[in-house]
């Protein structure tokens, strides 16, 4: 620190700041640096910030520095006056032009000499910034990384032209220092002076201060750099006279002369622009301006009161003098700069030339900032209050816990956990081997730390182990009359299922105890397999639990995970016992025929232990790892088909067929169950919506021919929903659905004809089939593919082509039938060689539907013989049965479904294998009523039925 008569100079690394002695005295002989330290007499500072950057950081001396700097700026040039002014200014100018001599390694910090700001400086380097524009009289730190712009700014500083144009980019996401087009920036910006520049090699960090608003006129080309003087490396020390002449010559040149004229070819990046000063509109200090000014000052003070971030700096700036308040131009800029508004809103204030409008816009932004500050303060108070309450509650709880522990009123956490688990087991009959495990785990729990992972694993294991209802059973209902009433109330038909459940109750009543059973209901969808299980649970007074294994691929879903895994838990069976709180629930395992298989194992194999009455008394779950007795559980499984159920699993279950419904059964179910349920669901009563039996019959016949009643339920609900809409919309007070207006509710009929052929031509025979959806009629068509050529020489053997998306089994059945038909015809009519020499095409209609199975063998033989003889079979005849190569008719399945399908199609005569006689006679009387049935053992019997008028002589007719 060097002192003289009027001034004190603070020496930095590359420049000095000149302060008046009264200011140094006011600071007590010390000066605050930008880093917050104090500079004492005789010390140096390398701080890069000028004194005006310290506004609001120290005592009131900061305001004096600000006022002094403003005064010096208005005075024009370096701090004039005093004997050190010329020398200090010269040395600072040398430092500003040539950088820091002997600064050593590290970044070069250049502090520029304060100089007179030119009123007109049209050619400026362009710096594009984002987010916040620079307002006049405000300082901003800017970093520049673009190499071309860095070189340009270095050259301008060396030429004593530390002026730039700072403009805001339209796109805030653009981080580049330069732009490729003037359209990427707002054309109104700020003329700024570089007060300090820190050269970091690959980038520049500058402190710039805005002075006035400017507007871009056009883009300029960057002028080439002038060659340096030959005596560049000569010593810097010159005579005072030479230095004075150089300064006079430099000051005599107008700054605008240093810029080059633009050329037609402009660079790709905008580095230099021509600007013109923005002139404010003339204004008078009216009452409106005074009111806006006062409101801005009031709002700023309110923001300061709410947000301490603004308090020190803004108070210092406003206390420096009332000149700020009296200057509407500066006040509007300061108000906008204090806000965190959007960039386009701040730019709007910068571009506004009408001072009252600018004041109004600045006031709007300040009001938004004030509301945001109030919201932040409210949220802060709420969070602080919540934290205080939580902390206070925690302290009180800890104190209460200590007091209770001292008085013996509260036990340790581990003791409380052990007491809770033992309390659960008091009323249960726990097996000895399970109780030993519980005692061992409780002892282990007492030795573990409360916060260890093993503690939580052991506690969860004990929680599951003590939640099992050991020895707890629900009181079963053994009253046959009550059970039968419940089953009849919930379901219509299903006599086989009801009879089996009543038998189970009767056996339990005679034995005086109940045992678990494994039943499997299989049949088409929608016949009530799942719902009957719930009714059985209600009839037996057992708890009900259902889970589906359709698509299940993980064995752990059934048998649980090992406790060593994170997040391990028991399987579905143990979860069922915990939920039902009894050891004798009814467990429904749904969709057992659709169980999957994955890399985790085969769940169907895991069910073998579960569904084996000899093994499930000691079922071992992987998680519990103790045997659990499931012998009292009634397991019911459901499936659509039995083919996909593994044979060992099927062997463990008692299979009960739940067949589809005929039209009479569907009508009864709809009237007794579906329509009342749908009315209640739609909020209607019988007087509001009427559905007659004729409507339901037509609905079943033309819309719902499947075996189940699920689709019928949907159609009934659809009719009642539309009825409810008409009533609510005011179209009608009540709705009566008739066969004539049924299409208005459910659309066009889905089924318009009963069967494909009303009269079957030669070569066409009706067969019977059944699928998971129920029974159906199936026509077999045969036709001549290529004419018979009796005069052809060589091989005259015929052929058979089959189509209709047939499976492998059905294709084999067709080949067997073709061979047998040729042999049968050759045996009974040697003269008829039609099948031997002809090329025949066999087709089963509805080719998009896959078909498979052996039961169409006799139907194919009959169709081939009908084609060979050229005579149709008996009308209204349908048949099913597998044929062997010798003509023996083998039994098939699905007799009930096939019989129902035949009756639905209007068939009056059916042919069945003799071994299926018992299945047919098990059917209800209303199903077999009106049917002529023939049980056959050999195809010769079928031939006599299909062609009743044919004699042996007719077979010999040549075609």
From Swiss-Prot:
Tissue spec. comment: Duodenum, heart, lung and liver, but not thymus.
Subcellular location: Mitochondrion matrix
InterPro entries given in the database record: AAA+_ATPase, ATPase_AAA_core, Lon_bac/euk-typ, Lon_lid, Lon_proteolytic, Lon_Prtase, Lon_prtase_N, Lon_prtase_N_sf
Residue stretch of the organelle transit peptide: 1-67
Range of residues in the leader sequence: none
Pfam families: AAA, Lon_C, Lon_lid, LON_substr_bdg
Regulation: Peptidase activity is subject to substrate inhibition by ATP.
The protein's Enzyme Commission number: 3.4.21.53
Biological processes annotated in GO: cellular response to oxidative stress; chaperone-mediated protein complex assembly; mitochondrial DNA metabolic process; mitochondrial genome maintenance; mitochondrial protein catabolic process; mitochondrion organization; negative regulation of insulin receptor signaling pathway; oxidation-dependent protein catabolic process
Region feature Disordered, mapped onto this chain: 77-102, 218-257
Any one of the GO CC terms: nucleoplasm
Biased composition (Basic and acidic residues): 244-256
Annotated Basic residues bias: 233-243
Entries under Gene3D superfamilies matching the protein: 1.10.8.60, 1.20.5.5270, 1.20.58.1480, 3.30.230.10, LON domain-like, P-loop containing nucleotide triphosphate hydrolases
UniProt keyword Nucleotide-binding present: yes
Record's keyword annotation contains Protease: yes
CDD domains: RecA-like_Lon
Binding positions for ATP per the UniProt entry: 523-530
Disease with which this protein is associated in UniProt: CODAS syndrome: A rare syndrome characterized by the combination of cerebral, ocular, dental, auricular, and skeletal features. These include developmental delay, craniofacial anomalies, cataracts, ptosis, median nasal groove, delayed tooth eruption, hearing loss, short stature, delayed epiphyseal ossification, metaphyseal hip dysplasia, and vertebral coronal clefts.
Subunit structure: Homohexamer. Organized in a ring with a central cavity. The ATP-binding and proteolytic domains (AP-domain) form a hexameric chamber, while the N-terminal domain is arranged as a trimer of dimers. DNA and RNA binding is stimulated by substrate and inhibited by ATP binding. Interacts with TWNK and mitochondrial DNA polymerase subunit POLG.
Domain characteristics, as noted in the entry: The Lon N-terminal domains are crucial for the overall structure of the protein, maintaining it in a conformation allowing its proper functioning.
Function according to Swiss-Prot or TrEMBL: ATP-dependent serine protease that mediates the selective degradation of misfolded, unassembled or oxidatively damaged polypeptides as well as certain short-lived regulatory proteins in the mitochondrial matrix. Endogenous substrates include mitochondrial steroidogenic acute regulatory (StAR) protein, DELE1, helicase Twinkle (TWNK) and the large ribosomal subunit protein MRPL32/bL32m. MRPL32/bL32m is protected from degradation by LONP1 when it is bound to a nucleic acid (RNA), but TWNK is not. May also have a chaperone function in the assembly of inner membrane protein complexes.
Name recorded for this polypeptide: Lon protease homolog, mitochondrial
Naturally occurring in which organism (per UniProt): Homo sapiens (Human)
Lineage, opening ranks: Eukaryota, Metazoa, Chordata, Craniata, Vertebrata
Gene transcribed to yield this protein: LONP1
């Amino acid at each position: 620190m060097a002192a003289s008569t009027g001034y004190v100079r603070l020496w930095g690394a590359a420049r000095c700041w000149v302060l008046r002695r009264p200011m140094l005295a006011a600071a007590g002989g010390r000066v605050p640096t930008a880093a917050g330290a104090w500079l004492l007499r005789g010390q140096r500072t390398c701080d890069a910030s000028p004194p005006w950057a310290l506004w609001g950081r120290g005592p009131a001396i900061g305001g004096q520095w600000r006022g002094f700097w403003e005064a010096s700026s208005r005075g024009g040039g370096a701090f004039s006056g005093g004997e050190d002014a010329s020398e200090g200014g010269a040395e600072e100018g040398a430092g500003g032009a040539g950088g820091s001599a002997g600064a050593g390694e590290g970044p070069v910090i250049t502090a520029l000499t304060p100089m007179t700001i030119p009123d007109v400086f049209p050619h400026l380097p362009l710096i594009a910034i984002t987010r916040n524009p620079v307002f006049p009289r405000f300082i901003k730190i800017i970093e520049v990384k673009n190499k071309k712009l860095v070189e340009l700014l270095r050259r301008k500083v060396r030429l004593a032209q530390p002026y730039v144009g700072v403009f805001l980019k339209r796109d805030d996401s653009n981080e580049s220092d330069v732009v490729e087009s003037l359209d990427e920036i707002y054309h109104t910006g700020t003329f700024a002076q570089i007060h300090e520049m820190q050269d970091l090699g690959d980038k520049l960090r500058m402190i710039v201060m805005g002075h006035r608003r400017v507007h871009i006129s056009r883009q300029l080309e960057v002028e080439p750099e002038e060659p340096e003087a030959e005596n560049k490396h000569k010593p810097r020390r010159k005579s005072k006279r030479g230095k004075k002449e150089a300064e006079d010559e430099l000051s005599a040149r107008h700054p605008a002369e240093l810029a080059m004229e633009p050329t037609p070819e402009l660079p790709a990046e905008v580095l230099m622009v021509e600007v013109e000063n923005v002139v404010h509109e003339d204004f008078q200090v009216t009452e409106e301006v005074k009111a806006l000014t006062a409101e801005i000052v009031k709002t700023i003070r309110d923001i300061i009161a709410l947000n301490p971030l603004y308090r020190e700096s803004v108070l210092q700036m406003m206390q420096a003098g009332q000149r700020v308040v009296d200057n509407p131009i500066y006040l509007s800029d300061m108000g906008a700069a204090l806000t965190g508004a959007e960039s386009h809103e701040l730019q709007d204030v910068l571009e506004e030339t009408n001072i009252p409008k600018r004041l109004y816009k600045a006031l709007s932004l300040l009001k938004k900032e004030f509301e945001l500050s109030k919201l932040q303060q409210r949220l802060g108070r709420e969070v602080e209050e919540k934290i205080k309450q939580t902390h206070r509650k925690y302290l009180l709880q800890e104190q209460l816990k200590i007091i209770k522990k001292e008085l013996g009123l509260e036990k340790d956490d581990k003791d409380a956990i052990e007491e809770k688990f033992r309390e659960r087991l008091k009323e249960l009959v726990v097996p000895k081997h399970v109780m030993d495990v519980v005692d061992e785990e409780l002892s282990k729990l007492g030795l573990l730390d409360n916060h260890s992972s093993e503690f939580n694993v052991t506690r969860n294991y004990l929680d599951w182990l003590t939640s099992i209802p050991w020895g707890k059973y629900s009181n079963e209902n053994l009253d046959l009359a009550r059970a039968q009433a419940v089953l009849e109330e919930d379901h219509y038909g299903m006599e086989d299922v009801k009879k089996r459940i009543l038998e189970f109750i009767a056996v339990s009543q005679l034995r005086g105890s109940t045992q678990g059973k494994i039943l499997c209901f299989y049949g088409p969808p929608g016949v009530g397999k799942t719902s009957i299980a719930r009714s059985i649970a209600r009839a037996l007074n057992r708890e009900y639990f259902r889970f589906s294994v359709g698509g299940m691929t993980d064995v752990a879903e059934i048998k649980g995970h090992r406790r060593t895994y994170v997040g391990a838990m028991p399987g579905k069976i143990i979860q069922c016992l915990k939920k039902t709180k009894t050891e004798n629930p009814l467990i429904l395992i749904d969709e057992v025929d659709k169980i999957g298989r994955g890399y985790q194992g085969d769940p169907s194999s895991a069910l073998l232990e579960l569904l084996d009455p000899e093994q499930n008394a000691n079922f071992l779950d992987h998680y519990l790892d103790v045997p659990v007795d499931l012998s009292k559980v009634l397991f019911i499984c459901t499936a659509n088909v039995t083919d996909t159920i593994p044979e060992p699993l099927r062997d463990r279950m008692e299979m009960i067929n739940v067949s589809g419904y005929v039209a009479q059964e569907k009508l009864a179910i709809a009237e007794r169950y579906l329509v009342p349920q749908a009315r209640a669901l739609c909020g209607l009563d019988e007087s509001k919506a009427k559905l007659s039996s004729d409507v339901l019959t037509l609905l079943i016949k033309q819309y719902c021919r499947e075996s189940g009643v699920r689709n019928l339920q949907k159609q009934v609900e659809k009719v009642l929903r539309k009825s409810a809409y008409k009533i609510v919309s005011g179209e009608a007070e009540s709705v009566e659905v008739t066969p004539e207006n049924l299409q208005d509710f459910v659309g066009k009929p889905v089924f318009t004809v009963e069967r494909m052929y009303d009269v079957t031509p030669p070569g066409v025979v009706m067969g019977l089939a059944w699928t998971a959806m129920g029974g159906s009629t199936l026509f077999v068509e045969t036709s001549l593919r290529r004419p018979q050529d009796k005069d052809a020489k060589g091989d005259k053997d015929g052929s058979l082509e089959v189509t209709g998306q047939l499976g492998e089994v059905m294709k084999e059945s067709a080949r067997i039938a073709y061979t047998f038909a040729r042999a049968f015809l050759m045996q009974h009519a040697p003269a008829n060689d039609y099948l031997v020499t002809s090329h025949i095409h066999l087709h089963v209609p509805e080719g998009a539907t896959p078909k498979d199975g052996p039961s169409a063998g006799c139907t194919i033989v009959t169709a081939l013989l009908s084609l060979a003889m050229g005579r149709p079979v008996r009308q209204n005849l349908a048949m099913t049965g597998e044929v062997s190569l010798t003509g023996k008719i083998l039994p098939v399945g699905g007799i009930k479904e096939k019989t129902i399908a035949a009756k639905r199609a209007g068939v009056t005569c059916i042919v069945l294998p003799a071994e299926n006689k018992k299945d047919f006679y098990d059917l209800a009387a209303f199903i077999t009523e009106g049917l002529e049935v023939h049980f056959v053992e050999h195809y010769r019997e079928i031939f006599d039925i299909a062609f009743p008028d044919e004699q042996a002589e007719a077979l010999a007719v040549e075609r």
